Regions:
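TRNA-binding/sensing appendages of the translation machinery
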Residues: 1-75, 131
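A structural signal for short, well-ordered beta-strand segments and their strand-loop junctions
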Residues: 38-41, 94-96, 150-154, 249-251
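Short secondary-structure capping/turn micro-motifs that flank functional sites
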Residues: 47-48, 157-158, 179, 347-348
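Positively charged, Gly/Ser-enriched RNA/tRNA-binding surfaces
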Residues: 19-34, 45-46, 74-85, 96-146, ...
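Short, conserved secondary-structure transition motifs
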Residues: 153-166, 183
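Phosphate/dinucleotide-binding and metal-coordinating scaffold of catalytic cores
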Residues: 86-90
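Acidic, His- and aromatic-enriched active-site or binding-groove loops in soluble protein domains
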Residues: 56-62, 167-192
Length: 369
């Protein structure tokens, strides 16, 4: 069968294409109206040390450089800021969209090809850049009909501090595995007693941000962790003043799935929708042997389509082939999708219904089917 040529995780899409196109335009237009410059990166790149384990690699000859199909656009945009845009004035505000491909799907996201949309602010140290990106993400999701949004806040700073403490432990990998499972009791059974308090304090910061923010004080064990606690509270305070209705969940025991995040990171979820609908955070970009701070977010169209309550449809109308240009332009201006009839019969309700039209033009009058 012809359908057998499509691998698992890929598909022909004939039902959601119109909605996807409208959502993408809505989000990108919103980015641009907020001063983000639209860029485009290639689907293929040469392999390098940053190539992920879930990257789709293209088989090549021994004497040829290995090629990858991109599985994430964020780092491509970061590279672009170091090359083509390196002479431009900082900070850069860039946005993008494009297809990405994964070697393997997951239980929460079995799709292996999907449209990625995102925005990045590169070279801005102020916490206000984080607030702007959070608001940009939240508003973008709202614009395409996503409701009951929950924002999860995390940071790798605290677990990194913990892993540094136990770096010589032979059970470090097992401890990481148990942290991913949120199995604190089993971790404490194999962890040296002197490290118990700090790890328990990290886990105590899991829950509603409003209820758990006071627990963050316990994590101020050095300059870096103290600075990060203040950073989280400052960003959240500013964000909540302007977006008071959103639910915010705190989880500092979450191990970062993205290797490049350097501090604060965030994930958006929607009620009754599997998996995240958007994610982002702080990361570092190298420029002229210096490290620049960047922040951004990305969302995936497959998740947006599942989460959105908005239904996009054209007002489709069946009209005679020889309709005047004036009337044709008038119908287009009014938002109709025009289907010109090339048959010999007179246009009627039955014909229009057969063509999946909601309207038809009969004797110069618009009628509903």
């Amino acid at each position: 069968m012809l359908s057998d040529i499509i691998p698992q995780g890929f598909k022909d899409d004939v039902h959601h294409t119109l909605t996807e196109h409208n959502f993408k335009n809505t989000i990108i237009n919103y980015f641009q109206s907020n001063g983000f410059f639209l860029v485009k990166t290639p689907l293929l790149e040469y392999s390098n040390k940053d190539t992920g384990i879930n990257t789709f690699k293209i088989i090549s000859k021994k004497n040829e450089k290995k090629l990858n199909i991109r599985d994430d656009i964020t780092m491509q945009v970061a590279r672009l800021s170091q090359t083509r845009l390196s002479k431009k004035t900082m900070p850069f505000k860039l946005c993008y969209y494009g297809e990405v491909v994964r070697k393997r799907g997951t239980m929460l996201r079995p799709e292996r090809q999907f449209l990625q949309i995102g925005a990045e602010c590169i070279g801005e140290n102020s916490f206000l850049a984080d607030v702007e990106i959070l608001e940009l993400a939240y508003k973008s999701l709202s614009l395409v009909g996503i409701k009951d949004i929950t924002l999860e806040i995390s940071s790798r700073v605290f677990l990194d501090r913990f892993f540094t403490k136990i770096k010589s432990s032979p059970k470090k990998d097992e401890i990481k595995r148990l942290i991913r499972l949120k199995d604190l009791a089993s971790i404490l059974d194999i962890l040296e007693t002197k490290y118990h308090k700090f790890l328990k304090d990290i886990f105590s910061c899991t829950g509603s941000y409003k209820n758990k923010k006071n627990n963050l004080k316990k994590l101020k064990v050095d300059d870096l962790t103290s600075k990060e606690v203040e950073n989280i509270n400052t960003i959240m305070s500013k964000f909540l003043k302007r977006n008071s209705k959103i639910n915010i969940f705190l989880d500092l025991s979450e191990i970062d799935k993205k290797y490049y995040h350097s501090g604060l990171r965030f994930t958006f979820f929607s009620k009754n929708i599997r998996g995240e609908i958007a994610q982002g955070g702080r990361y570092l970009v190298r420029k002229d042997d210096k490290k620049l701070i960047a922040t951004g977010f990305t969302c995936y169209m497959d998740s947006l389509l599942r989460a959105s309550s908005t239904k996009i449809s054209h007002k489709k109308i069946l009209v005679p082939f020889n309709i005047s240009k004036k009337n044709l332009q008038l119908f287009i201006k009014k938002g109709y999708s025009i289907l010109r009839y090339t048959g010999e019969k007179n246009i009627n309700k039955k014909l229009a219904r057969n063509q999946k039209c909601q309207f038809y033009l009969e004797n110069n009058k618009i009628k509903k089917t």
